[in-house]
Amino acid sequence: MGSNRGRKAGGGSQDFGAGLKYNSRLENMNGFEEGVEFLPANNAKKVEKRGPRRWVVLVAVLFSFLLLSLMAGLLVWHFHYRNVRVQKVFNGHLRITNEIFLDAYENSTSTEFISLASQVKEALKLLYNEVPVLGPYHKKSAVTAFSEGSVIAYYWSEFSIPPHLAEEVDRAMAVERVVTLPPRARALKSFVLTSVVAFPIDPRMLQRTQDNSCSFALHAHGAAVTRFTTPGFPNSPYPAHARCQWVLRGDADSVLSLTFRSFDVAPCDEHGSDLVTVYDSLSPMEPHAVVRLCGTFSPSYNLTFLSSQNVFLVTLITNTDRRHPGFEATFFQLPKMSSCGGFLSDTQGTFSSPYYPGHYPPNINCTWNIKVPNNRNVKVRFKLFYLVDPNVPVGSCTKDYVEINGEKYCGERSQFVVSSNSSKITVHFHSDHSYTDTGFLAEYLSYDSNDPCPGMFMCKTGRCIRKELRCDGWADCPDYSDERYCRCNATHQFTCKNQFCKPLFWVCDSVNDCGDGSDEEGCSCPAGSFKCSNGKCLPQSQKCNGKDNCGDGSDEASCDSVNVVSCTKYTYRCQNGLCLSKGNPECDGKTDCSDGSDEKNCDCGLRSFTKQARVVGGTNADEGEWPWQVSLHALGQGHLCGASLISPDWLVSAAHCFQDDKNFKYSDYTMWTAFLGLLDQSKRSASGVQELKLKRIITHPSFNDFTFDYDIALLELEKSVEYSTVVRPICLPDATHVFPAGKAIWVTGWGHTKEGGTGALILQKGEIRVINQTTCEDLMPQQITPRMMCVGFLSGGVDSCQGDSGGPLSSAEKDGRMFQAGVVSWGEGCAQRNKPGVYTRLPVVRDWIKEHTGV
């Protein structure tokens, strides 16, 4: 007992005095007390040291100290840093060409799997021993899976190496090898190994890779569809700080089609978001990653992926504690394509990337040889083109691409045409081992080389447009070639410095229509000046300086800086009565008011889905893309007007929708039904759609049914809505909110897709722009009031039509929130040139809305 206590005490507190060369304590030696006595000298001057000798001694002592320090440092380096090792882990795969795949290899606990895995590990060890920079530092390897072809082994290898050899090891492992290993041990038969490749991974992933607590293996059977989900889906969130994986297999000579039906994980951010990755392999190697996913996708988003062989690996790595349901996915097998491409010999036709509109598979090459009659030329028009790789700079076609006439095309491109000067053209499509996309949809056409666009104008891209669109001031060709080298009509056109022709009423409208700014030069205010809303010109330096230099406050509106200024109709007023110089400060994610009132009541304007589907031909909206859009149905008449949700109990619409006529009492709230969360008018009973009756209708008391001034109405719902992924409110702007000319805004509704056409079944969307108020008044004199705003394209083509009345104008503001800029009111015709749509301006009636709804 005493001995143990002595060792314990010694371990915690040592007698450091025993280790000192000199000790101030007196020691008992041989039983006697010893000391040191200094005797006085007979002649002090003789024994006194001379000055110069002292310096020699000091230098010697200093030199000795430095030498000892250097030796100590070298010893520390030798015994500590020289022995430091860096952990390197590599994921890889190899092919065993003289083996046949057995079904038992799918089960990692089977005798056959264990036996073959042991031999592969021994083969890897022998292989590394052949490389001087690898063999001495190889710690261990492990086989994680096998798949067909003859037999592909997936493995990881761990090395412990000196830091100065790290790069050499990386280079050695990056070499793809083809080797034959003779039997050097009893347990190792002769292996012919090809395609021995490996890629570095984060060593921290090794522990997660070895954890099988959230690992699943699934095999497709026949044509059946197999479903799998994250743990707990959809009733509880997936586990935090975990790694889950799904090994998906199909039969030999098949490929897999994988679709995520529902996808909701933590948002993508820079803080290490949760991540789902799909690999065209059974090893999580970056060069074989097909896609990485995070965030929330709408159900209609294209999340279908094809493998190049009969396996997929899906991993979920969670780094956050945020609670999300995860995903639901399905997969099935289909026969592997024996060839891709082909010979096309009709006068016209279509072709696409493999499995379009699903993502094309990795590692594929397709060639289409197109031949039309000898007396005709051929051109290819790509109607849709998505070949985007997240790791490739725009314009660099080094991975996935389409090649025609020696030129490569990649990325995301709008419709374009490639022509041949003969009756033949060859289109080649290539995808590498990683990251795939939707691909392309194309058509080929034959044409007369002497007249490629009969009776029409041909853009340099090969597109044909009507001749009257040439030099009309609007770019109808994607490359603007229809507006170049024009002679402008001085009566109604302005000649830009870049030789473009623009309508005269676009001059000095505060929008750079020419592109070079020449249509805004020489206007009422000189260069370097600011034009106040009252027409006064000020030096640019006086804008946003905290002083009302204009006299109407407009020089202090829309400022990035935040200053407390005198209150005007242009300044934002906080709840405490103070006014800010900053423009549109409400709900922008930054607290500007000292009382925080600018960031209150901001549960609005955000979509539940962070990822929306691409517009693939047409203007159909996506599910949940406009969750504040409402469809109003009149009894026995179906959809008549639109509306927007601004709170659980209130809608905003247009007053003219509720004016009685001799046949129907539209002002009677009992005649109306509101559908929220609706996308397709033919599926009003679909899951997520809420059908509600109205409680009352409030039209603006100043509404004029002749001029449509003050065209706005408030609708109270009979009961509160339930917010969901497809039902959310839009933000209402402050009375001082500014939607400047040129700003992009979205119009939505089920109205007619063209003038005189029928209503759409699927919710439609169109991007339009705010038009300068002066220009608007010039286009429609004596018709526009301060409560109205013009929005659209003066070139026509996109507009709201009958049936969209009462629907919202949605404007994306700071922080990504959507604010309602206006209400669809009226217009002359539908999508006509110089006839933009007219909308009720929301900020002007904001106080009236708040008075009646409290919103």
UniProtKB/Swiss-Prot annotation:
The chain crosses the membrane at residues 56-76. InterPro entries: CUB_dom, LDL_receptor-like_sf, LDLR_class-A_CS, LDrepeatLR_classA_rpt, Peptidase_S1_PA, Peptidase_S1_PA_chymotrypsin, Peptidase_S1A_matripase, SEA_dom. Coiled coil: none annotated. Disulfide bonds join 214-244, 340-366, 397-410, 453-464, 459-477, 471-486, 488-501, 496-514, 508-523, 525-537, 532-550, 544-559, 567-579, 574-593, 587-602, 641-657, 776-790, 801-830. Highly expressed in intestine, kidney, lung, and thymus. Not expressed in skeletal muscle, liver, heart, testis and brain. Residues 77-855 are extracellular. Residues 86-203 form the SEA domain. GO terms for molecular function: serine-type endopeptidase activity; serine-type peptidase activity. The active site is at 656 (charge relay system), 711 (charge relay system), 805 (charge relay system). It is a single-pass type II membrane protein. It is found in: Membrane. Residues 451-488, 489-522, 523-561, 565-604 form the LDL-receptor class A domain. Residues 615-854 form the Peptidase S1 domain. Keywords: Disulfide bond, Glycoprotein, Hydrolase, Membrane, Phosphoprotein, Protease, Repeat, Serine protease, Signal-anchor, Transmembrane, Transmembrane helix. Its main location: membrane. Its EC number is 3.4.21.109. Glycans are attached at residues 107, 302, 365, 421, 489, 772. GO terms for biological process: cell migration; epithelial cell morphogenesis involved in placental branching; keratinocyte differentiation; neural tube closure; protein catabolic process; proteolysis. Residues 1-55 are cytoplasmic. Interacts with CDCP1. May interact with TMEFF1. Belongs to the peptidase S1 family. This is Suppressor of tumorigenicity 14 protein homolog. It comes from Mus musculus.
